[in-house]
Each structure stands twice: as structure tokens, then as C-alpha cells.
């Protein structure tokens, strides 16, 4: 589901020239726009990832990719406004978080960090490093020695986990801009022109 699919169309429009000048030319529509409640859920999901477990780590891309990110507005689609009646229990303000290129890159870096190689000893059961052991009577046997491969493989995983946590922290502290309808239209110098429906609702000719 896209953001714009949830927005009602018609009833008016923004000016075509201001839209081109302030939105298209400045690539505002190329930024990610995530509804505030979806953004808060995404951050909670990313914080909850157990990086050391591959099945949990592999969810990072899904968490990020499934969130609608398109600009919830168009020339003839007005940015979402509040829902319900002001002062009543059904009133809800609608905010979107704008994810610019720098913050977008950090989110994409989370996917890359989570895609690092598996801990091969723990997750695909690679045998332990064999060593030759000399027993009583001089008999020699090849036995597995725990720890050699484990240390080698788990250290990058620990480093990756630390890097992932720092990235999540940076994303949370970045303070992404929030927009409601009024802020969006004020910031990008857009005016919504109301267009009245055709007389009779456009349902045919005169009687």
C-alpha cells in the first residue's frame, strides 16, 4: 500500500508551476515520506532486532522495505489533513516524517550491515577446527577443538552488532522533520485551489 493511495483525490489542485518549481525541481518527491506512526513502529522494530541471530537479522530489510515511503501528495492530491472533528474524541492529526538522502543512506546501511555473513559455527554448524591429540601410550587421534573457528567468526559478528546499534542510535537522534498539511504547504509555498463539482454532480445533461 502506498501513501498516496490512502489520500482522497479531487476537489481541487495545487498550482502546476509552483509544484514543478518547489517539489519536482528540488526532488522533494524523491525523499522518503513515512507516516509518523509507521516511523515509530519501524524504529521499535529495528531496536528489537537480535543481531546475533540470523533469522532476526534478516528481518531488517523487510522492516524497512514494507513501509510506504512515497510523497502523499500530487498536483491534484492534497497533502493529508487532520481526521475527525477538532475537539471531539475522533480528532486525529496526521504527520509524516521526511527522510532526506543522508538519513535514507543510514537506513540502507542498516540493511547492508544486517546482510553480513552468517556466524558459520553457530548458524550452519561448521565443524570445529581439528587438532592432533596424543593420548596414553603415544596413540594419536584427530579431535575437534572448540573455540578456534568460533572466535574467528564471532568477532566480526560482534563488531557488526555494535555497528548496527550505533547506526540505529544515529537514525533516532537525527531528528527527522515532521510535516502536517499546514507545514507542508507553508514550507514548499503551495496553495490549494478548491474546485467546485459540476452542477448536478456531473451526471448527464439538462432535463
Curated annotation (Swiss-Prot):
Q: What domain of life is recorded for the organism?
A: Viruses
Sorted keywords for this record are: Capsid protein, Helical capsid protein, Virion
Q: One GO CC annotation, please?
A: helical viral capsid
Principal cellular location given in the protein's record: virion
MF terms from GO for this chain are: structural molecule activity
- Give the subcellular location: Virion
The record, for Pfam families, names: TMV_coat
Protein family according to the UniProt entry: Belongs to the virgaviridae capsid protein family.
The task this protein performs is described as:
Capsid protein self-assembles to form rod-shaped virions about 25 nm in diameter with a central canal enclosing the viral genomic RNA.
Q: Mind telling me what this protein is named?
A: Capsid protein
Look up and give the organism this protein is from: Peanut clump virus (isolate 87/TGTA2)
Q: Which gene does this sequence derive from?
A: CP
